A protein has these predicted regions:
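Conserved acidic functional residues
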Residues: 116, 170-171
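Glycine-rich phosphate-binding active-site loops on the catalytic face of alpha/beta enzymes
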Residues: 21-22, 37-48, 135-147, 172-207
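Conserved active-site-proximal phosphate/metal-binding subdomains
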Residues: 152-167, 173-315
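Active-site entrance/lid segments in N-terminal catalytic domains of soluble metabolic enzymes
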Residues: 1-161, 165
Length: 315
C-alpha cells in the first residue's frame, strides 16, 4: 500500500482542505494546517499579487505545511505558477486542465505536486509523470466535477496506483467517510464543503446559513450542456439555469454569460438568490458554525471510533 498523505506532506491528520474559488484564503488554510490537516489557498479568479500576498500571510499564520490550488483553465495560470515557485508553499494541487507540463518547474522549486484527477486514465498518467500524490475527486464534490462517483473512482483508481497516496474527494464530510476511504486504501481525504461553515472561513454569512439549512438533496448540477459541470445549492439562479439548459433555446454564449461571476456573487457578496452557491453533497453534517480545530477533532474522533468498530466485523 502507498504512503499516507500524512507522510508525504508531514502533517498530523490525513485531511486536506479543498481549494474553493473566492473562499479558500490564508486564514482558512492556516487554521486547517494548525489543526493538523493541510490547508489550501485557492487561486481561482485571483491575481498573481493576491496569490503572493496570501502565501506570505499564511506563512506568518502557521509554520505547518500548506498548499495552493491552481485551476488550469485560468488565463493567468502560468504567471500564478511562477509566483508559487518563487514563494514556495509546501505543495500545489492542480485541476481543470493538463497538469503534467507544470510538474518539472514546481518540483525544481521543491514544491510537491498533487494533481486532481477525475478518472483512472488521468490517474495513471500523472503517477507515471512523477506526481507526489493525487486527489481523485468524485462527482459528489462541490464546484467543477467529473462524471464518476467517488465510490467508482475509489474502487478503480486505488488498485492501479501503487507508489503514491490517492487522496479521495467528493462527498466527504465526517469521520465515517474518512474511515471508509482509509479502509479502501486511500491515503487520506479532501474536504471542501465541510469547512465552509468554519469560523475561519471567509464565505459570506448568508451562504453559511443556507448551507446549515440545506438537506442532502439540496444540490443541483449546472453546466452539463456546456461541458463544464458545476455542483451547487439549489436556488433561483441554479434551477432557472438548468431549466434553460434543458429547454435548449438559450445559446451556449448566453449561458456562459449568465454563469460568469455568480460564484463570487454568492460567496463574497452574499446574494444567495442570484448567485451560485458551490457546495458538495455532504450537507447534513453542516449543523453550525464552529472553529476549524473543533471540526477536525470531531472528524478524527469519529474516524477512530468507526475504524475500531470495523475491526469487529466478521464476514
Amino acid at each position: 500500500m502507498a504512503k499516507s498523505i500524512t507522510e508525504v506532506l508531514g502533517i498530523k491528520y490525513p485531511i486536506i482542505q479543498g481549494g474553493m474559488a473566492w473562499i479558500s484564503d490564508a486564514k482558512l488554510a492556516a487554521a486547517v494546517s494548525n489543526a493538523g490537516g493541510a490547508g489550501i489557498i485557492s487561486c481561482g479568479g485571483r491575481t498573481t499579487e493576491y496569490v503572493r500576498e496570501e502565501i506570505r500571510k499564511a506563512k506568518q499564520l502557521t509554520d505547518k505545511p500548506f498548499g495552493v490550488n491552481v485551476m488550469l483553465m485560468a488565463p493567468n495560470k502560468d504567471e500564478i505558477v511562477d509566483v508559487i515557485c518563487e514563494e514556495k508553499p509546501a505543495f500545489v494541487t492542480l485541476g481543470a486542465g493538463n497538469p503534467v507540463p507544470y510538474f518539472a518547474k514546481l518540483k525544481e522549486a521543491g514544491i510537491k505536486v498533487i494533481p486532481v484527477v477525475p478518472n483512472v486514465k488521468l490517474a495513471k498518467r500523472v503517477a507515471a509523470a512523477g506526481a507526489d500524490a493525487m486527489v481523485a475527486e468524485g462527482m459528489e464534490a462541490g464546484g467543477h466535477i467529473g462524471v464518476l462517483t467517488t465510490m467508482a473512482l475509489m474502487t478503480q483508481v486505488i488498485p492501479e496506483i501503487k507508489d503514491i497516496p490517492v487522496v479521495m474527494a467528493g462527498g466527504f464530510g465526517d469521520g465515517r467517510g474518512l474511515a471508509a476511504a482509509m479502509l479502501m486504501g486511500a491515503g487520506g481525504v479532501q474536504m471542501g464543503t465541510r469547512f465552509l461553515v468554519a469560523e475561519e472561513c471567509s464565505v459570506h454569512e448568508n451562504m453559511k446559513q443556507k448551507l446549515i439549512e440545506a438537506v442532502d438533496t439540496d444540490t443541483i448540477v449546472t453546466g452539463l450542456t456546456l461541458g463544464g459541470a458545476v455542483r451547487g445549492i439549489k436556488n433561483k439562479f441554479s434551477t432557472e439555469f438548468v431549466q434553460k439548459e434543458n429547454e435548449g433555446k438559450t445559446s451556449k454564449e448566453e449561458l456562459i454569460r449568465m454563469a460568469t461571476g455568480t460564484n463570487k456573487l454568492a460567496a463574497v457578496e452574499g446574494d444567495v438568490v442570484n448567485g451560485m452557491m458551490q457546495a458538495g453533497q455532504s450537507l447534513t453534517v453542516l449543523q453550525k458554525v464552529e472553529p476549524v480545530a473543533t471540526i477536525i477533532e470531531d472528524i478524527m474522533k469519529q474516524a477512530r471510533e468507526t475504524l475500531s468498530a470495523a475491526a469487529t466485523i466478521k464476514l
